[in-house]
Amino acid sequence: FRSNLVANPVDDVKAPKRLKSLPKALSVEQALSLVNQAVKEAAEKKDLETVRDAAIIDLLYSSGLRLSELLGIDVMQSKDRQQESAGWLDWDAAEVTVLGKGGKRRSVPIGGPAMQSLKVWRTVRDQLKQADVSKALFISATGTRLSPRTVQSRLRTLAMRAGLPTHVHPHMMRHSFASHVLQSSQDLRAVQEMLGHASIASTQIYTSLDFQHLAQAYDKAHPRAKAGK
């Protein structure tokens, strides 16, 4: 049959583009519930793990860091060429400097509540005998830099204790940060800089999340939103 055709009728037909899935983000209420749960447990138990967890989760949501960036942070900047810090905290300026994708550094502000959680953690950290053997800000009881798996596991179990109905992972905190800052500020360029995106196209996906938020608010508030549905 095909040998009798002069031209293939589907030569110019393009396959439909695969829709890019939107990043999963927590609602503002869910994110605050998670952070508040961590801070509450830290205040009640005052042990190494809960105080450290509160500082980690507060910082993830406050500054939108990647997990690798978070775990690369040192307590202070080391300018030693042999042991140059990948990231560090400026405790006076309330800023964190991290080494992002492509070896690009960026500095991101830290909110007041997150700085408070970090200061509480630093006090606990400095009391560890093993603290002197590591420059890392976030360490285990043995003084070693935390592993990604440890953070992922503890965040997941904390989210369950907070009653969140979804699997929470560190990158979801970054998505939540971006979505919530964009909802509040509408400043796409600022969000791009804080996330460390080389292209603004990577940041624009959060405008879809922002539109979802607006659509939900419209459906709830507008008297004719559901007309004809």
Question: What do these predicted regions represent?
Answer:
Residues 1-229:
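Conserved catalytic core of the tyrosine transesterase superfamily
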